[in-house]
Amino acid sequence: MLLPPYSPPQRSFGFGKLLLLLVLISGSAGAGWWATTNWLMPEQAAEPPLEEAVEPGSDESPRFSEAEQARKAELQARREELGIPYQFYINLANATFYERYPDQRDRTLTDGAEDEEWRSRWDAIAAEWLDLLEANLSPESRRQLGSYDEGDREQWKQQANQLYVGSRSLYDLADAEFFRLFPQAKDFIDQPIGQVWQGIVFDRLKALQDGSMLEQVQFDTGTYDKQLEGQLEPGEGRVYTANLSEGQILRLSLDAPADATQLSVYLPRPTSDLPALLEDSTDTTWSGNLPQSGFYEVVVVSTASEPIDYQLELTVDNVTSSPVEPEEPEAPEAKN
């Protein structure tokens, strides 16, 4: 892990809130240092500032020990196998290196023996990132790191909306995993690590689309109560959608280990005055009259450090009859 072990953040998640967080990994790869353009990977086209500089693993690298050449060659091969874009990998490792060793920010590492220890530390950071990205992002997600942007996020939002799921639910799922990995993360969206968050969003959208993290609640004929259950790994979550009517009374009861979950209830059409009925709450119960007709989203995410089992009871009643679903729910585009 690049950062301390997970402890549940006492904050509200959601992409809008992410933009307000403070800096996680300061610095950039703009200044760079000699190692990242010369002795790490053969793909970089920049001219080396030292005449002795050659590619890793080459017989013409007399200033690197055989062990160092082998280490760098292994990093290169592993990065390529994982499909992680070169420049993103450099930027990500650089940002972490500068964060850990800020005294190195204004100097250029050389290929000499005096910087052997610093090169070793950079390589160790790069290896940590390869481990983390392999374990927590899909191959498809990894291949796009460094290229995610606002246009992608807008497209993901539209795709989630087609499932009657809003961006808040999607980002809740991503935040749960991201903050498990980086509990101190702040103001990261424009930093290299922000690409990791967006990669997680991409994977969570796929999980919604394949149904592994999404379930539409259907009431059996003549009933108004639904018992749901499941197991969540650390950083996992699940979205439940239910097509309900304005004026109905919704009651939720979540049975899970203490302080191990966050619960949200999102509206069919969120507004600035009423964006949610419940958001990122450690509460395990909620009840109230529904203000709108359409698809409501109930999101359960795990903040635990080990797998948990949970049961969710969803009860809807009406003064005259059992729940009546609207014949024509709102268009998916009503979500945001």
Region annotations inferred by a language model:
Residues L228, Y240, L250, Y310-L314:
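Hydrophobic residues positioned within well-ordered beta-strands of beta-sheet architectures
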Residues V217-R238, N243:
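N-terminal edge beta-strand
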Residues P8-E47:
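Membrane-anchoring helices that localize proteins to membranes
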Residues L214-D225, T315-S321:
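Extracellular, modular beta-sheet/disulfide-rich ectodomains of secreted and cell-surface proteins
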Residues A35-T221, A334-N336:
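Long, low-complexity, Ser/Thr/Pro-rich intrinsically disordered stretches
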